[in-house]
């Protein structure tokens, strides 16, 4: 169960609320409907569930206590990152992955 969000924009997408222009610009390129579906999956899934849902590409972030799944598809530059706590998921947020190979 999602217990907290790292920012208001991610929380608004989860709740289906309207984003401000600034929030929408920051999340440009993110397919919001698909991202909302992924947040709903996170909200009801256990870690075991995430491990078996291969399409999410669930993994631990190297050198961190945070985890990640694809936000809206494998070829997207967007991920949903979060931390596990005893009571559920915390600090859930959308993160745009930058290409460092340019």
Predicted regions and their residues:
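Enriched for short, Lys/Arg-rich terminal
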Residues: 62, 66-102
């Amino acid at each position: 169960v999602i217990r907290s969000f790292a920012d208001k924009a991610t929380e608004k997408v989860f709740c289906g609320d309207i984003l401000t222009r600034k929030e929408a610009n920051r999340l440009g390129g993110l397919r919001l409907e698909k991202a909302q579906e992924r947040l709903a999956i996170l909200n009801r899934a256990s870690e075991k569930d995430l491990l078996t849902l291969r399409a999410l590409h669930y993994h631990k972030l190297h050198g961190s206590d945070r985890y990640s799944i694809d936000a809206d598809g494998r070829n997207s530059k967007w991920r949903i990152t979060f931390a596990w706590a005893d009571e559920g998921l915390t600090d859930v947020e959308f993160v745009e992955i930058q290409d460092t190979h340019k």
